[in-house]
């Protein structure tokens, strides 16, 4: 685990630190679909058809806050957030609901594992202008929409 003030690992990110394997919190597995791994983060599509929503989970054991990442890793994460923004916009386009605004948040109040939400929003979406967290009940994607959303997100992320 990286501790505050440490420089982190040199070179490519790894799934293993301090003899422990990186694992995704079960809450993410229950509420989202895996898209694939970027240089630092595991990318997922949130399972809520109301909002084109990408979640990035940096593959760092024990990371809970941005400050738990080395400076270079934070730079990589910011690049991945921008790519996730393009992916959320691509999902919105694929679903016929172009995005007007991106919401980006790193909360962790409920699921403490470090993660970043990137959500494409529109003035006519179910929660606008309020935050999407805790708004109503998630709506499952129809199978064709799920496939289109995943394909659009993966293309935009380069996966």
Where do the PLM segments sit?
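N-terminal amphipathic/basic-hydrophobic helices that include classical n-h-c signal peptides
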Residues: 1-19
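HIT superfamily nucleotide-processing domains
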Residues: 16-159
